[in-house]
């Protein structure tokens, strides 16, 4: 099983090594800090590289065993890359706002997900029998629920691993995962504490390029795990890729 490859140069170009201002540091991150430059802490990338590799291995192995990964990143610059990476790798995400109890009170959350599915079905059927006011109210509910729960609507239960951008902002998500014994992979900046994180990735959690790089690598690791899972089940991945073309030809022949 091949892991996605990355180089220290890629990390440098993405600004992964830039921490926060030295006065805003968290002493718990001191083992991962190389030094300071112009009042900014610089991360020790010779540690980040192997730790990122370990994190990607954990993600790949989780998916290879049929596990689900939940991507969590609700800050503005993380929202889009988090959703794209999760969708690309057939995983799940929360990028709007972490709802308290998402993991620890899954039963209640799943009721809200069922409500979203019911609304979607009703709207798809044309919302028959509703007044204009009722329809507008339903559309508003649909938008709210989709923003909050759209990324986990098909998760079907609590995830097997969390991937988090910004441990300070997502402290509640990490606390819930810790309570349930769900492993956490997270990018930890110099102003944060690594406590509660099983697989620490010491790095910048604000720069758009850095966030995109983490998300891309994690998505690729999940896809590697998926191909390993399918391979172990005896599925011919080459045949899967060719199937849609063959089906299209068969359909054309049937219609001729």
Curated annotation (Swiss-Prot):
<keyword id="KW-0687">Ribonucleoprotein</keyword>
<dbReference type="InterPro" id="IPR018130">
    <property type="entry name" value="Ribosomal_uS2_CS"/>
</dbReference>
<dbReference type="GO" id="GO:0022627">
    <property type="term" value="C:cytosolic small ribosomal subunit"/>
</dbReference>
<keyword id="KW-0689">Ribosomal protein</keyword>
<comment type="similarity">
    <text>Belongs to the universal ribosomal protein uS2 family.</text>
</comment>
<dbReference type="InterPro" id="IPR005706">
    <property type="entry name" value="Ribosomal_uS2_bac/mit/plastid"/>
</dbReference>
<protein>
    <recommendedName>
        <fullName>Small ribosomal subunit protein uS2</fullName>
    </recommendedName>
</protein>
<dbReference type="Pfam" id="PF00318">
    <property type="entry name" value="Ribosomal_S2"/>
</dbReference>
<dbReference type="GO" id="GO:0006412">
    <property type="term" value="P:translation"/>
</dbReference>
<dbReference type="GO" id="GO:0003735">
    <property type="term" value="F:structural constituent of ribosome"/>
</dbReference>
<dbReference type="InterPro" id="IPR001865">
    <property type="entry name" value="Ribosomal_uS2"/>
</dbReference>
<dbReference type="InterPro" id="IPR023591">
    <property type="entry name" value="Ribosomal_uS2_flav_dom_sf"/>
</dbReference>
């Amino acid at each position: 099983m091949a892991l996605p490859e990355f180089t220290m140069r890629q990390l440098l170009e993405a600004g992964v090594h830039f921490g926060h201002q030295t006065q805003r540091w968290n002493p718990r991150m001191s083992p991962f800090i190389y030094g300071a430059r112009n009042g900014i802490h610089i991360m020790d990338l010779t540690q980040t590289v192997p730790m990122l590799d370990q994190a990607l291995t954990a993600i790949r192995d989780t998916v290879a065993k049929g596990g689900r990964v939940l991507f969590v990143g609700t800050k503005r610059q993380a929202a889009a890359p988090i959703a794209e990476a999760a969708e690309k790798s057939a995983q799940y995400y929360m990028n709007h706002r972490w709802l308290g109890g998402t993991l620890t009170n899954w039963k209640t959350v799943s009721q809200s997900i069922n409500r979203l599915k019911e609304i979607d079905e009703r709207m798809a059927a044309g919302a028959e029998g509703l007044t204009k006011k009722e329809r507008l109210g339903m559309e508003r509910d649909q938008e709210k629920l989709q923003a909050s729960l759209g990324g986990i609507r098909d998760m079907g239960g609590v995830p097997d691993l969390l991937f988090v951008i910004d441990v300070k902002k997502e402290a509640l998500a990490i606390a819930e995962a810790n309570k349930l014994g769900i492993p956490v992979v997270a990018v930890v900046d110099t102003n944060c504490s690594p406590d509660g994180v099983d697989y620490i990735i010491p790095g910048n959690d604000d720069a758009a390029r850095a966030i995109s790089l983490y998300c891309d690598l994690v998505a690729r690791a999940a896809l590697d795990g998926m191909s390993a899972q399918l391979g172990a089940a005896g599925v011919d991945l080459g045949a899967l890729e060719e199937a849609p073309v063959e089906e299209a030809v068969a359909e054309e022949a049937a219609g001729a």
